[in-house]
């Protein structure tokens, strides 16, 4: 086993993990979803999410992710049944499995800034920062800085922040006096 073939030194499990890291780099997504909800404290459900996308003929690759992380679901992508999605939306699993994986195996990622913001947002969730308006604002700002500065978000950042900061009062005008 010479220096010419260093891959021989990786165990089978370690090889799977490095392969999975490359897959996540190209086909993976970390995000903080922000969904309007009338009964949520600040008007939104805000949650970390992790996904990997593959054509349905490559399901085995998603099953590898399921094997490595020992959790997650696989289902067709909404609106495109030829694409399958492997997903983890459990905050605990993201904290215990995904973040440590990203820190260990995604060290040279072109998307490392997004991964760092994602990890920071998850840390804020773990510290229960999302239970205060100030903490929720921090998390939402991180979310909008991720993935090309939130360009594909449904709502502008200021609209979301305004709703959080006003304490989620109803969107309807009050009685006229």
Model-inferred region functions:
Residues 1-177:
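Sequence-level preference for short, compositionally simple segments enriched
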